[in-house]
Amino acid sequence: RGPESELMLRVCGGRYAAKTYASLIRDAKYALYYPSSRGMIISLTKANHRSNIIPKLTGLFRDWGLRHGTHYDVNKNDYEITLYNGSIIYLRTSQEPENLPGPDLAWLHPDEYKSMPESIFTQVLPTVRQYGYPHQVWLSSTPGGAAHWSRRIWQPDQYAIDFDLEVVPRRAGR
């Protein structure tokens, strides 16, 4: 049983630890390995997709011998990457939550989720249900800190110890 059998994987590390790049490798490999799969990368802004995500993904494709126009296309108007095998990578932002719901997805990758509200994650998680594919969610970010919403998900016992208060009514005379 390896990481491929888990529904959700989290990649955390310090700045410049290549978390996004490692996750993009996973995004691209999934899209190539599973024809006609649909996945979504959620970034904070469209500018991040333009300056960071798209260049890194297309660089990976180029390094793997794939050619633009032959093996993949980038639609910069709709923020979608379509591969020759029918797979689609949707590029969406947390600043436009109205654009998040949509097609059923096989995989989901919120990048820098630390800066996103929990509602973004909970809004799009139910769409990871594309029939016939292994469903995966991988998140990449610098750590969110002890009080971040993600800690409730991945470290619930520790979160409860540190942050939940048990209120016990006082009895008279105590």
Regions found by a protein language model. Give the residues of each.
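Phosphate/NTP-binding elements of NTP-utilizing enzymes
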Residues: 1-174
